[in-house]
Regions:
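N-terminal leader/presequence regions that precede the main folded/catalytic core
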Residues: 2-9, 21
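Auxiliary, metal-adjacent structural segments of Zn-dependent hydrolase domains
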Residues: 13, 17-79, 86-90
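Proteins with a high burden of low-complexity, intrinsically disordered sequence enriched in S/T/G/P/A and R
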Residues: 1-2, 70, 107
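Active-site recognition of the HExxH zinc-binding catalytic motif
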Residues: 95-107
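Residue-level signal for functionally critical sites in structured catalytic/ligand-binding pockets
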Residues: 6-7, 15-18, 106
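Intrinsically disordered, low-complexity segments enriched in glycine/proline and serine/threonine
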Residues: 6, 83, 88, 103-104
Length: 107
């Protein structure tokens, strides 16, 4: 249900799409904070084994009500990462990405 609602939202919104290494990234809302998306994802790519990265189909960055409701910055759901656009710096974003990829590995 969550994915279906997001897909409908994504179809009706102006988005920025990026491909960084194996990651397909959809930016729903601009990132707030001193963050270099390319550098952050590049660091993750250099840090984690490649087979971990293939567990992620898409990364959504933005404001999501379900993140706020759960009081979390990021969430892994069915091959997708949902990450808040409110990030302090590169390390904050990297931490969120790696933490959620760890959940993908657990599954």
């Amino acid at each position: 249900m969550l994915k279906r609602n997001l897909v409908n939202y994504v179809k009706n919104k102006d988005l920025i799409e990026k491909k960084i290494g194996p990651f397909h990234i959809i930016i729903k809302d601009q990132i707030e904070g001193e963050v270099d998306i390319e550098a952050s994802f590049g660091s993750v790519i250099r840090t984690l084994p490649g087979h971990f990265l293939t567990l992620i189909d898409v990364v959504y960055i933005g404001q999501f009500s379900f993140l706020e409701e759960k009081e979390v910055n990021a969430l892994y759901v069915d091959g997708s990462l949902f990450i808040t656009n409110v990030q302090d710096n590169d390390d904050d974003l990297i931490d969120d990405i790696i933490h959620e990829i760890a959940h993908a590995v657990e599954d």
